[in-house]
Amino acid sequence: MQIDFAPSRQSTLGVEWELALVNARTGELVSVANDVLKGVAANHPDLNEDDEHPHIKRELLLNTVELVTGICETVKDAKEDLSRSLAAVREVTDPMGVEVFCAGSHPFSPPLLQPVTDKERYAKLIERTQWWGRQMVIYGVHVHVGIDHRDKVLPILDGLVNYFPHFQALSASSPYWAGEETGYASQRALMFQQLPTAGLPFQFETWEAYESYVQDMFTTGVIDATSEIRWDIRPVANLGTIEMRICDGLATLEEVGAIAALTQCLVDEFSSILDAGGSIPTMPPWHVQENKWRAARYGMEAIIILDAEGNEQLVTEHLAETVSRLEPVAAKLGCSEELADVLKIIQRGASYQRQRRVAAEHNGDLQAVVMDLVQQMRKGPDA
């Protein structure tokens, strides 16, 4: 089948931020997304689009709302867009006694008790995936970056895969699941890949090979729409982007900006390499798979595989080197401050580390963990 890629202005940006809705007193998940979205639409009738705010959307579960930016030139623009949408949500949730937070999962609310949004595509997903599908109490951050030519898409995607463990370690924020300590920095990473077509992307030499794969998925009934290919990094042909979907939910706007800047800078660097006639190294799938597991298990303490030769390094050390290398790219893109925030995450610890510290300080009380995440979203990561 033919998949037309609609080129975008190179390195333009879009960000999606999935937020959990919780009881402001108990920290438990509350399934009030429909009420929240109705309230937002009523407060902003001039923005309604099919009875829905164009930047505040439903998700799989009724305990979730998703903030979606427009097309942005800079990370600063994206952060401002998300901040406006978050304020619109709070206009409704504050009087309801509902708080919002973001992490890769909810530390203690039971997954199987969470109602699903009443949409046909979600009903089909749950019908097909059953127990695994009903476990998806997970939240993430997705970053779209515009690509100006179809032939760049797959090489850039492969390049981003090399940085999978970097994104996973920085964002890891789901050490708890249904009240239990999992021993993993990111339970979400291993949970989400249980869905059909989710997980690591395949490597394709040509766009035609990718088209052939998608055709096979349609022919065999695996998918009914291209959007049902839920890879951790994927092309989005109709938008003209690559979508980086690796990350666990991020607790603060500062951290969202850091991840967006790292994504934008890497994509822009890869694009420039290709424009200059260069190539982007890839790693064997077995190294990529191992890197994903290591980052999910060990987070910021992961020793990651760097290349096809099997060289290894502590992920935080390689992150610091990567940020230094990308500083000229960030200056060009206007995101130097946000890229530097990657180093702040390394210094203060990723969310999973902060959650464990809070739990230890409160004798294992996971309600305290949720309330701390709530305050971080309101006041920043140093709250």
UniProtKB/Swiss-Prot annotation:
Catalysed reactions listed for this entry: L-cysteine + L-glutamate + ATP = gamma-L-glutamyl-L-cysteine + ADP + phosphate + H(+)
Residues in coiled coil: none
Q: Where is the signal peptide?
A: none
Which top EC class is named for this enzyme in its record?
ligase
Free-text function comment from the UniProt entry:
ATP-dependent carboxylate-amine ligase which exhibits weak glutamate--cysteine ligase activity.
Annotated family: Belongs to the glutamate--cysteine ligase type 2 family. YbdK subfamily.
UniProt-recorded name of the protein:
Putative glutamate--cysteine ligase 2-2
